[in-house]
Amino acid sequence: GLAVGHHGLMGKQNLYDHSVRVPLMVAGPGVPKGQKIDTPVYLQDIMATALELAGLEKPDHVEFHSLMPLVRGENVRPYDAIYGGYLDAQRSVTMDGYKLILYPSIAKVLLYRLTDDPEEMNDLAGKPESLPIIKRLFARLLKLQVETGDELDLKSVYASLL
């Protein structure tokens, strides 16, 4: 998606939900109609989902998950956190109803409680009570960096969050 003026931005170069969270529709045999699921997933999950819908086995090198358990209404969360990045300019993690966005070149931290603020308009990062949440999300973000092979150094920029 495009920002089209949201947050004062015009393009796609951001990690706000209006730009990175796009609608996905699944249709086919065995797929219930009229269902809406809000669980965050990765675009790469589509391959595993398509393979399952086609009755084919997922190759071992495919790291992502089929969305069919979600589609069938099973109570699963394929990921405990969703990782995002844009070049070396931004990183994000969405977890437990929060989103942490980092701009390492300017050492900026943004925190949103998505359950209360789905439009990401009320930055909570400056509130003292948010620091434990920021640290928890930052720790998970660092683990996701390792898992994905992301070598951007966030530890030196955000040493106070360690």
Name these PLM-found stretches:
Residues 11, 30-40, 53-58, 121-130:
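Active-site rim elements
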Residues 1-32, 42, 91:
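Histidine-centered active-site microenvironments of extracellular/periplasmic hydrolases
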Residues 11-13, 23, 108-109, 129, ...:
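Generic secondary-structure boundary signal with a strong preference for alpha-helix termini
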Residues 1-6, 44-47, 52-114, 119, ...:
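C-terminal cap/loop subdomain of S1 sulfatases and analogous C-terminal strand-loop tails that border
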